[in-house]
């Protein structure tokens, strides 16, 4: 058994080539081979978001705090709240991040395939993000 104590792992800023705005990533766990699962706590400050990306074996997001948005390529923008669990299937192009007026923290869980857990694409532009209604309005649609 291995216990990783809270606060014992170093966090880092989300790289600007993959994120817009201030993002903090705290690795939580990474299994040893033959396991390939890893997880991190990711906090997006208000207005921060990930670029479009895919995961070769999918991704699960567990929203822990705040309010955010998630969208699959070509799909509607969905509001996400604490307790929501988002399942992104393998290869689904998507993005996620905070609303303009609230930070959002989620736990991200994904598996490695051939040494990769994510394939990054273009950033979610400010023009698209500015057109998003508030989380309350998205919830009502």
Language-model features, listed with the residues they occupy:
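A short, N-terminal "cap"/entry segment at the start of jelly-roll beta-barrel domains
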Residues: 1-37, 117-141
């Amino acid at each position: 058994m291995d216990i990783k104590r809270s606060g014992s792992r170093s966090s880092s800023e989300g790289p600007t080539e993959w994120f817009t705005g201030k993002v903090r990533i705290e690795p939580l766990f990474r299994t040893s081979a033959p396991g390939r699962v890893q997880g991190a706590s990711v906090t997006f400050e208000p207005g921060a978001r990930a670029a479009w990306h895919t995961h070769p074996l999918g991704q699960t997001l567990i929203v822990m705090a705040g309010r955010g948005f998630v969208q699959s390529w070509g799909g509607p923008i969905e509001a996400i709240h604490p307790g929501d669990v988002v399942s992104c299937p393998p290869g689904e192009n998507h993005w996620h991040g905070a609303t303009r007026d609230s930070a959002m923290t989620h736990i991200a869980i994904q598996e490695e395939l051939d040494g990769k857990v994510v394939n990054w694409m273009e950033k979610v532009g400010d023009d698209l993000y500015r057109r998003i209604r508030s989380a309350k309005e998205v919830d009502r649609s």
